[in-house]
UniProtKB/Swiss-Prot annotation:
The active site is at H11, H47. It comes from the Eukaryota. Its main location: secreted. Transmembrane segments: none annotated. It comes from Loxosceles boneti. It catalyses: an N-(acyl)-sphingosylphosphocholine = an N-(acyl)-sphingosyl-1,3-cyclic phosphate + choline; an N-(acyl)-sphingosylphosphoethanolamine = an N-(acyl)-sphingosyl-1,3-cyclic phosphate + ethanolamine; a 1-acyl-sn-glycero-3-phosphocholine = a 1-acyl-sn-glycero-2,3-cyclic phosphate + choline; a 1-acyl-sn-glycero-3-phosphoethanolamine = a 1-acyl-sn-glycero-2,3-cyclic phosphate + ethanolamine. Binds 1 Mg(2+) ion per subunit. This is Dermonecrotic toxin LbSicTox-alphaIB1a.
Amino acid sequence: ANKRPAWIMGHMVNAIAQIDEFVNLGANSIETDVSFDSSANPEYTYHGIPCDCGRTCTKWENFNDFLVGLRKATTPDDSNYHEKLILVVFDLKTGSLYDNQAYDAGKKLAKSILQHYWNNGNNGGRAYIVLSIPNLAHYKLITGFKETLTSDGHPELMDKIGYDFSGNDAIGDVASAYQKAGVTGHVWQSDGITNCLLRGLSRVREAVANRDSSNGYINKVYYWTVDKRASTRDALDAGVDGIMTNYPDVIADVLSESAYSAKFRIATYDDNPWETFKN
């Protein structure tokens, strides 16, 4: 049977030591917060207070140091390599920036990732990367990122980059932001809320419907932050591709239940995260 590849996304992995911790619990993907300084340089992998219930909000690294740790965890011949870690979502905390700094943020982000993660195109980390942007007005971050990789001689690395607007905006508004950014694929659509609060699945279902329609812009849908078995089952029943969680082992447990193991499998590196799954 054709099973939907599933991404178990470890939430708020902001210290290098947490990469091992979350992957060992079953995550094949992690989400990392990126804060910016006043000149739009990516500065720390830091969330800050408040954050999810039951989590420490203040773990951090310098962004470039984190990229090096992540590179080691995703480079096949490295002693820190995790074969199953195949995707990272950078949750870009651009709320501290003016709208007109978005292009610069994208440019500086690209330079950091190119140097410290991709090793300037020389046997760097292999994980796919989703740039997750909280504000539709900051779509030029994507433009800045793309133009910088191109001008720095590595346009091919855009094959490894996907996109997400994480503000729970109306699906139509997200579509027009992508149009402005010139994005025509590699789209992950998030929906969710902190684990301290409850959120229904109506917008998730709308995103799934867009993904599965012939003219939708979405390739993958993920839901955050899910820590309980019941809400995991509800999200899987709604047809999501990814679940972001503080407890990867809980999601892995549910995926191993017979009802779900018949329909889902844990995604591997061979699963293209930019491809819409067709049943």
